Amino acid sequence: MRGIILALLLALAGCEKSQYEPFFSESKTYVYNYEGIILNGIPENGLARSGIKLNCKVELSGYAQRSYMLK
């Protein structure tokens, strides 16, 4: 009986609909700040590595139905 209940719960959890397409309101502007580091070199002790740090500000706003403008 426990096995049947467990199987039903797993089947119910597996059939849940996932929404992968993002939804953004056309009347709002969304602002995101990204930061990243890129490192180059050989990952051995005593060897030099170089890198660069990137900062980015992204503005996303609605342009038309299902169309968005990225700045």
From Swiss-Prot:
Organs and tissues of expression: Produced by the liver, secreted into the blood and then sequestered by receptor mediated endocytosis into growing oocytes, where it is generally cleaved, giving rise to the respective yolk components.
Domain Vitellogenin: 24-71
Induction conditions: By steroids (estrogen).
Molecular function per GO: lipid transporter activity; nutrient reservoir activity
Keywords: Phosphoprotein, Signal, Storage protein
Record's function text: Precursor of the major egg-yolk proteins that are sources of nutrients during early development of oviparous organisms.
Record-given protein name: Vitellogenin-B2
Protein source organism: Xenopus laevis
